[in-house]
């Protein structure tokens, strides 16, 4: 249990730090669809897709690494709550098209990046 906790703490602290750095760097560039939030969510999708494909090929890998990458790193890096509050703010301001665009770009983009990560590893290890 302690080992699992440390895996999540280590991965989460790296993920949270990356999220903060990327969001700080990019969000002011285009406030209607904050790119920092989008970048971290897309990056987390890519990482978890590559991790899933890799872990499927390494069934005996210590669960520590799986927890550190998926729950820790990707959980700390991605941010559904910030995405939600940004969409909510757009809706409150009457920017319905931007809100819908944000939802579509985040959800479809994250799915595409997850699939891309999965297929990159699948091709590399074929």
Swiss-Prot record:
It catalyses: fluoride(in) = fluoride(out). Na(+) is not transported, but it plays an essential structural role and its presence is essential for fluoride channel function. One of its GO terms (biological process) is cellular detoxification of fluoride. Signal peptide: none annotated. Coiled coil: none annotated. It is a multi-pass membrane protein. Na(+) binds at residues 75, 78. One of its GO terms (cellular component) is plasma membrane. It is found in: Cell inner membrane. Its main location: membrane. Pfam families: CRCB. Fluoride binds at residues 41, 110. The keyword Protein biosynthesis does not apply. Keywords: Cell inner membrane, Cell membrane, Ion channel, Ion transport, Membrane, Metal-binding, Plasmid, Sodium, Transmembrane, Transmembrane helix, Transport. The chain crosses the membrane at residues 4-27, 32-55, 64-92, 96-121. GO terms for molecular function: fluoride channel activity; metal ion binding. HAMAP family: FluC. Fluoride-specific ion channel. Important for reducing fluoride concentration in the cell, thus reducing its toxicity. Belongs to the fluoride channel Fluc/FEX (TC 1.A.43) family. NCBIfam families: crcB (TIGR00494), PRK14196.1 (NF010792). Shows a double-barrelled channel architecture in which two fluoride ion pathways span the membrane, and the dual-topology arrangement includes a centrally coordinated Na(+) cation. The Na(+) ion is probably an important structural element stabilizing the dimer interface. This is Fluoride-specific ion channel FluC. It comes from Escherichia coli O45:K1 (strain S88 / ExPEC). The gene is fluC.
């Amino acid at each position: 249990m302690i080992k699992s906790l440390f895996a999540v703490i280590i991965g989460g602290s790296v993920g949270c730090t990356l999220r903060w750095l990327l969001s700080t760097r990019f969000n002011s560039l285009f406030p209607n669809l904050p790119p920092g939030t989008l970048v971290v969510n897309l990056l987390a999708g890519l990482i978890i897709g590559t991790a899933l494909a890799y872990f499927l090929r390494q069934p005996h890998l210590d669960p520590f690494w799986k927890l550190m990458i998926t729950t820790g790193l990707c959980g700390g890096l991605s941010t559904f709550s910030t995405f939600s509050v940004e969409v909510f703010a757009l809706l409150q301001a009457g920017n319905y098209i931007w809100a819908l665009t944000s939802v579509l770009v985040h959800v479809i983009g994250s799915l595409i990046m997850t699939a891309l990560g999965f297929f990159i590893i699948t091709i590399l290890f074929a």
